[in-house]
Amino acid sequence: MGKADNYELYSVELGPGPGGDMAAKMSKKKKAGGGGGKRKEKLENMKKEMEINDHQLSVAELEQKYQTSATKGLSARLAAELLLRDGPNALRPPRGTPEYVKFARQLAGGLQCLMWVAAAICLIAFAIQASEGDLTTDDNLYLALALIAVVVVTGCFGYYQEFKSTNIIASFKNLVPQQATVIRDGDKFQINADQLVVGDLVEMKGGDRVPADIRILAAQGCKVDNSSLTGESEPQTRSPECTHESPLETRNIAFFSTMCLEGTAQGLVVNTGDRTIIGRIASLASGVENEKTPIAIEIEHFVDIIAGLAILFGATFFVVAMCIGYTFLRAMVFFMAIVVAYVPEGLLATVTVCLSLTAKRLASKNCVVKNLEAVETLGSTSVICSDKTGTLTQNRMTVSHLWFDNHIHTADTTEDQSGQTFDQSSETWRALCRVLTLCNRAAFKSGQDAVPVPKRIVIGDASETALLKFSELTLGNAMGYRDRFPKVCEIPFNSTNKFQLSIHTLEDPRDPRHLLVMKGAPERVLERCSSILIKGQELPLDEQWREAFQTAYLSLGGLGERVLGFCHLYLSEKDYPPGYAFDVEAMNFPSSGLCFAGLVSMIDPPRATVPDAVLKCRTAGIRVIMVTGDHPITAKAIAASVGIISEGSETVEDIAARLRVPVDQVNRKDARACVINGMQLKDMDPSELVEALRTHPEMVFARTSPQQKLVIVESCQRLGAIVAVTGDGVNDSPALKKADIGVAMGIAGSDAAKNAADMILLDDNFASIVTGVEQGRLIFDNLKKSIAYTLTKNIPELTPYLIYITVSVPLPLGCITILFIELCTDIFPSVSLAYEKAESDIMHLRPRNPKRDRLVNEPLAAYSYFQIGAIQSFAGFTDYFTAMAQEGWFPLLCVGLRPQWEDHHLQDLQDSYGQEWTFGQRLYQQYTCYTVFFISIEMCQIADVLIRKTRRLSAFQQGFFRNRILVIAIVFQVCIGCFLCYCPGMPNIFNFMPIRFQWWLVPMPFGLLIFVYDEIRKLGVRCCPGSWWDQELYY
């Protein structure tokens, strides 16, 4: 049934009734396993229901419990004592992390620690060599300083990004009302809201925020907006009556920080500050620990591999060096050199810059990223848990269907509502429109004539706002039309009568009759009618028309829409002459025998772009789950309209209805879709929820509490999913914080949701998430290419030391030279790969599996190290031996030459031609070899960056010049190489020497070989999917 027949507060239960709660069970399970601690135990306890019974107590019992008076309030003395005992009515901020600790964390990550160790070794080597008067001591000093600079600069960049994020608790503090009207000792006055205590008697009116959790004692037409707390778009009635055993569903409790829309109310404060529901949510959100992002896990995994290999090879070289007679100091220098060669010093900067670039790209598309690592996480997302109100929907009630003249007509629910197509010539329609316009207390805020009708601000509740805007769009000047029918009497809507009635004089001064109009719950309105208006004629309301009404009502209610009935009655001049004194207390006018005009249904409609966005998510293998505090029928209807429940999918209830069998006789695995409400979720075992998520691909959770949203996210994560949570309300903030990535709405989103989220959609458009997913997948793809490019040169940087120790040739490559490769020439091409376009439709691929699809996997390492890296090593040694031979040192003579070459006292070492070389001349030649090997690596790296443009498609298909940043980076790389080679002063500072032009040409055939070799690899991958070739060579 639709929601017109009841104006109940939907459940936001925090946990269990007598049967216990899923969060509580999970808490017990975790404790039994030995995990937890006080922080976790406290967090789990927050997921339990607020154990209060104030809503069930009589006024006298409340007075006794809180030592207060329902008429005079607390005494000032007792209020002061309670304030001293309980503290102010404010949210307690959590202990913040000191800024120096945040900065220190940026300097102490896995890769940073490895670089600190390398820098320390360099400093130790420099100190020892300096004490011995070694001529090459400056190398190690420069190397140490460069490594420290890299760590500090990248740490400062990361700290700056973190510094821009705001503390989550600040948004909740913004929700605290400034003033509250309180009665103490019988005197009414205003105080700061943070001075309220339990037992205070307070008053509130339309436009006020509820200053605490309040037990309602008296109310007149009071309605509150719980959308920021529960996710519902409809206003909720507040009254003194206890309507539900749960304190969170009864109408006689008003929640702290919710907005009072209209009417007045008086009540007793029963909870303040952190003990209120909003306080518990604030504690829950700030208590949820930040989970590591997938990209952080991937980088840690990569660092572990690199650190292990660096230490393994470094220790091996150290032992070998000691065994063959090197001193401890020289062996430590080898160890340090291997670490420096293996640690990709530029990777830290590369990853940070790549993520920043993509974040800026997303910002241009209305996606603001607060946490850089969240960029890639969104691309890894396999499940999106989306709030309904304001995220999938427009967060405004809109007239969607009308039933008059025995036909259901569809209204336009798009953002501009400009396409009303139903017949507006019928006399019945005119009568219905007259009733819905006059029987309406909502009004436009003045000064909005130039504002489009759907965007105008209206003073009134959501339903009446929808009716007023609909009337304005169809009639024209609705407020002017209303003025032509002056109101003389009114009965506001209340939960007992469930109708609103008003009496008006007619616009024609010659017609002295009065017009009575009524709207309300359809069945309540119909029972007061004796006739029905059909095509302008009043017909008896017989059984046939009652069945027609029931059919239409069930049809609209089944769509999850809120349905209202409308009727009217012309009061005769004889019985109700002009100036007649209508009395709403005495009811001296008829309220039965009315004429039924029709039905109007309203819904918070989906955004126009959402269905297509959901379809794209489905195509990309991403599961969209709706999690809302709204009614199950409404949630299911919206889910079906946007494609979360696809066409033809059935729930267990749908199958039972189709087969006409009880629900318990249906195999749940036959149902593709499933709708679970909060009460059902509360009684489910954790394993049952996980099984439901595994069994039903299409899931909708309705009437859920903030804590249950958190449990749902945790259950999805237990299935191995990377979970994104979208939302805009306060109720969403704990789940936003817990999720792998939280996505908040920028326009309608609360400050709490924005601060809890990792990403903010500035246009509140769910469809923008699809853009984020695509960019996230692209950044992972490009990071993979960048890392593959970065790793390749590790082999040509490592093998010179291997040959140096094992074959005893003069050292081909110096540590400072390696650092220039890492931080100067190669960082620009590496970063430029972040600008590379997607090589195929990545939105047709399934999300990556974090356990299988690693950033650095075996095929990538094998291909980079042992294939492309090996070719680059051959190129380097070819160029090295060429340069040595042209200066008189043939390859065979170089073997075993190292001891004599490095002997400071030997000043007449003969080359292959018999020429004698001093130590200074030999050192000059060694620096020349450093430069030659450096240039060889750089020439091969140009070919390497070109092949890294794609992993599967041919480079010719991708295009060589589409990525202009990469072309510029290659040119810049060559310019830096020339500068280092030919700039005066370089030999004395960084050990770079001018080299002959032909030595630049030696590595070029190897670069061509790299390109051709990779094109053959890609051809095999494309032609033989699933084959050994594909599995081993596709990284």
UniProtKB/Swiss-Prot annotation:
Region (Disordered): 1-41
Modified residues (Phosphotyrosine): 7, 10
Cytoplasmic side: 1-98, 164-299, 350-783, 835-854, 950-963, 1019-1035
Active site: 387
Main location: membrane
UniProt-recorded name of the protein: Potassium-transporting ATPase alpha chain 1
Single GO BP term: intracellular sodium ion homeostasis
Record key words, sorted: ATP-binding, Cell membrane, Hydrogen ion transport, Ion transport, Magnesium, Membrane, Metal-binding, Nucleotide-binding, Phosphoprotein, Potassium, Potassium transport, Translocase, Transmembrane, Transmembrane helix, Transport
Species name: Oryctolagus cuniculus
Gene: ATP4A
Similarity section: Belongs to the cation transport ATPase (P-type) (TC 3.A.3) family. Type IIC subfamily.
Keyword Lyase among UniProt keywords: no
GO CC annotations on file: apical plasma membrane
Complex and partners: The gastric H(+)/K(+) ATPase pump is composed of the catalytic alpha subunit ATP4A and the regulatory beta subunit ATP4B. Interacts (via the P-domain) with ATP4B (via N-terminus); this interaction stabilizes the lumenal-open E2 conformation state and prevents the reverse reaction of the transport cycle.
EC id: 7.2.2.19
TM segment ranges: 99-119, 143-163, 300-319, 332-349, 784-803, 814-834, 855-877, 930-949, 964-982, 998-1018
InterPro entries in the cross-refs: ATPase_P-typ_cation-transptr_C, ATPase_P-typ_cation-transptr_N, ATPase_P-typ_cyto_dom_N, ATPase_P-typ_H/K-transp_N, ATPase_P-typ_P_site, ATPase_P-typ_TM_dom_sf, ATPase_P-typ_transduc_dom_A_sf, Cation_transp_ATPase_P-type
Biased composition range(s): Basic residues: 26-40
Residues where K(+) binds: 340-341, 343, 345, 797, 822
Modified residues (Phosphoserine): 27, 463, 601, 840, 954
One GO MF term attached to the UniProt entry: P-type sodium:potassium-exchanging transporter activity
Reactions performed catalytically: K(+)(out) + ATP + H2O + H(+)(in) = K(+)(in) + ADP + phosphate + 2 H(+)(out)
Topological domain spans for side Lumenal: 120-142, 320-331, 804-813, 878-929, 983-997
Residues binding Mg(2+), per UniProt: 387, 389, 728, 732
Physiological role: The catalytic subunit of the gastric H(+)/K(+) ATPase pump which transports H(+) ions in exchange for K(+) ions across the apical membrane of parietal cells. Uses ATP as an energy source to pump H(+) ions to the gastric lumen while transporting K(+) ion from the lumen into the cell. Remarkably generates a million-fold proton gradient across the gastric parietal cell membrane, acidifying the gastric juice down to pH 1.
Subcellular localization, as worded in the UniProt entry: Apical cell membrane; Cell membrane
Pfam family of the protein (one): Cation_ATPase
